[in-house]
Amino acid sequence: MTNISAFLVKKLRARTGVGIMDCKRALMCMKGDIDKSVDFLRKMGQIKAEKKQFLLTQNGSIFISFDHNLGVMLELSSETDFVSKHKDFLCLGEKILDYVLTHPMESIEFIRKHFEDLRTSLVMQVNENIVIRRIQTLNKKYITGYLHGRRIGVLVQTSSINNHLAKEIAMHIAASNPKYLRSDLVPKSIMEREYEIQLELAMQSKKSKPILEKIIKGRMIKFANEISLLGQNFIFDPHRKVSEVILKNNIDVISFVRYEVGEKYI
């Protein structure tokens, strides 16, 4: 029998909101695998969706800088929230941004090496580990950015200038956390995983096969839209999808990047 620690139960509960005993049972059935336990609970109908699929585990700050032709976003990690607000921690982040803005970024490994002395000095000063976790640049036209409390940062590339709408789209991305630009860009593996879950849930209703297929199809469309920017309802006009808003304003969203402090990413 798999030994399930209290830490694993707490972690699964934080991720799903399900009760302690149900979390423990799921972990035992799935031999301690967190991701499989989430799917197990969903198939049992105990959670409708996983709201914290990209689990937040660290402290730190997001830094962004942008003009119409270049955007740079950095996540600088720390062990505690206190250090993430330290003036020298913030100063290091701004120095890294300034460097990337004026020098072609070869790789994050190069940036880490270039700033290693400053990072080490800060580590000794605050007695915490500091990590240059990730950096993203958008080196194209019509870049807009948004920073929410240094916890969430967004860069958006649009097809033309519309500063007000582009800013609202960036704010929408920060709030709604889409993972993909369009529903057809959702990876096949993600859709297949969700299909298995929805199939299991639908079969519990004991409806006829044609009705089940219709239910599953509707749920899959909804799922793909909910994690895709253009399929989401626009937070500033909830009766319209983002795709409808940009069509009305004759503007396209070409790409976007969203960082949230500590999130799991690939």
Curated annotation (Swiss-Prot):
Compartmental location: Cytoplasm
Alphabetically ordered keywords of this record: Cytoplasm, Elongation factor, Protein biosynthesis
Transmembrane segments: none
Pfam families tied to this protein: EF_TS
One term under GO cellular component: cytoplasm
Molecular function terms, GO-annotated: translation elongation factor activity
Alphabetical list of InterPro entries matching this protein: EF-Ts_dimer_sf (IPR036402), Transl_elong_EFTs/EF1B (IPR001816), Transl_elong_EFTs/EF1B_dimer (IPR014039), Transl_elong_Ts_CS (IPR018101), UBA-like_sf (IPR009060)
Region of interest (Involved in Mg(2+) ion dislocation from EF-Tu), ranges: 80-83
Main subcellular localisation: cytoplasm
Family: Belongs to the EF-Ts family.
The protein's role, per its UniProt record: Associates with the EF-Tu.GDP complex and induces the exchange of GDP to GTP. It remains bound to the aminoacyl-tRNA.EF-Tu.GTP complex up to the GTP hydrolysis stage on the ribosome.
Entry protein name: Elongation factor Ts
